[in-house]
From Swiss-Prot:
One of its GO terms (biological process) is symbiont-mediated suppression of host innate immune response. Pfam families: Viral_P18. InterPro entries: Cys-rich_furovirus (IPR016567), Viral_P18 (IPR007609). Residues 86-116 form a coiled coil. This is Suppressor of RNA silencing.
Length: 174
């Protein structure tokens, strides 16, 4: 296998050292081998998106995904420790705050349209706009419910793990 198509730059002459260079290098390896780029999926399952191209080793000409120091070890510790729950709670809370702000904005618009004095030309459009806004409020409310359910699930799993009668945590080395 030749290294002609692999990423190289001045900062990674002795091998890729930064996350950015490792990512570019891995993408170039995937492309050189004619493979589709496989993104790191482990943290996405935990509610945090990494997007780093997954590391692999070739075994009998076939790529086998593996963990490494740039991405895998970080995620390995992240998953084993349960620290991902905090990040997932933060992202779900941020999403919930955004949805609540959007819902308040929509309700204010509905109230303004319902109570406002409008010229006759605008009155023809008010019912359509109200219907559209009410449908959007319904969608936002549904998304909020999904987000709240996700928050409850994460908090429940954290509480089960912290319960005094829970089984001892066994950390296995990979």
């Amino acid at each position: 296998m030749s290294t002609v198509g692999f990423h190289t730059c001045a900062s990674c002459v002795d091998g890729p050292k930064s996350i950015k260079c490792v990512s570019k290098y891995r993408i170039s390896v995937y492309k050189t081998l004619g493979l589709d780029v496989v993104k790191c999926r482990l943290p996405a399952d935990c509610g945090v998106n990494c997007g780093m191209p997954a590391a692999f080793v070739l075994e009998q000409g076939h790529p086998k995904l593996t963990m490494d120091g740039y991405c895998g070890e970080k995620h390995r510790g992240y998953v084993l420790s349960g620290a991902w729950r905090h990040a997932q709670l933060r992202s779900l809370n941020a999403e919930l705050d955004t949805l609540e702000a959007r819902e308040e904005s929509l309700r204010a618009q509905i109230k303004a349209l319902s109570a406002g004095d409008h010229c006759p030309a605008v009155l023809a459009y008010v019912p359509k706009k109200l219907t559209k806004l009410k449908a959007e409020v319904h969608d936002v409310t549904g998304k909020k419910q999904v987000c709240i359910t996700g928050l409850v699930d994460v908090m429940d799993s954290a509480l089960v793990r912290l319960a005094p009668d829970s089984p001892p945590k066994k950390i296995s080395s990979l």
